[in-house]
Design a protein with these regions (language model features):
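Hydrophobic beta-strand residues of extracellular immunoglobulin-like
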Residues: 59-63
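Conserved GNAT-fold acetyl-CoA-binding loop/helix
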Residues: 24-50
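Conserved acetyl-CoA pyrophosphate-binding loop and the N-cap/start of the following alpha-helix
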Residues: 133, 137-145
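Intrinsic disorder/low-complexity segments
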Residues: 68-83
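A short beta-loop-alpha structural element at the N-terminal edge
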Residues: 6-21
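Conserved GNAT acetyl-CoA-binding A-motif
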Residues: 143, 150-163
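Conserved acyl-donor/pantetheine-binding loop and adjacent beta-alpha core of acyl/acetyltransferases
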Residues: 57, 79-134, 149, 182-192
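C-terminal "cap" of GNAT-fold acetyltransferases
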Residues: 156, 163-167, 173, 179-200
Length: 200
């Protein structure tokens, strides 16, 4: 596959349908080495998904890629009038000024109260990359955009709840493990998650 142009922009409500498809594909394919099928399906049903609060806050980003040749299997068409032929949705991720550490709209453990950038860490949230674009720098570019935006908002430290799969990326970018968490999803099924932090 030839090299691709990558651009990062803020997610919009019109992106939600494509983001959901991307997230489901990302979880089922990229996390298969770290979680059982039952864990992945339970996560999609109860925890993982689009967080519309991030979109409303203007803190959710999507990565679009455009290659020099057509790759219809790679990601979902962006659907934007200014996107042009060949742009596809390849990843998403955001940051938050709220207490929620992880989880989509349907997760019962959400806490939408605001945090104080003088004392609290910004939350790095909801990172997913389409399998066709894995290990091509998509996640790193989204993370960079999130850290810059959160820093501009006054935050100096960052915190996240990483999947076993995603923890590899964050470790490479300076995040360290703070604790291991077992998230009870449904009867008999839990998800191991790693809380990670990055400080100045």
């Amino acid at each position: 596959m030839k090299s691709a142009r990558i651009r990062i922009r803020k997610a919009e409500s019109a992106d939600v349908g494509r983001m959901r498809e991307l997230i489901e594909c990302s979880v089922r394919e990229l996390q298969a080495a770290d979680y059982t099928p039952a864990q992945m399906e339970a996560a999609l049903e109860k925890v993982v998904g689009v967080d519309s609060q991030l979109i409303a806050d203007g803190t959710y980003f999507v990565a679009e890629v455009r290659t020099s040749s057509a790759h219809p299997e790679a990601g979902q068409p962006s659907g934007r009038k200014d996107s042009g032929v060949g742009w596809v949705l390849a990843g998403c991720g955001g940051w938050s000024k709220r207490k929620t550490l992880f989880g989509g709209d349907h997760w019962s453990g959400r806490e939408n109260a605001l945090v104080d950038p003088k004392h609290d860490a910004a939350k790095i949230r909801a990172f997913f990359v389409h399998p066709a674009w894995a290990r091509r720098g998509i996640g790193s570019k989204i993370l960079e955009a999130c850290e810059i935006a959160a820093s501009t908002a006054g935050f100096t430290s960052f915190e996240l709840g990483a999947t076993l799969t995603g923890a590899k990326l964050f470790k490479e970018r300076g995040y360290v493990e703070a604790e291991k968490i077992e998230v009870a999803v449904k009867s008999g099924i839990s998800l191991p998650v790693i809380r990670m932090v990055k400080r100045p």
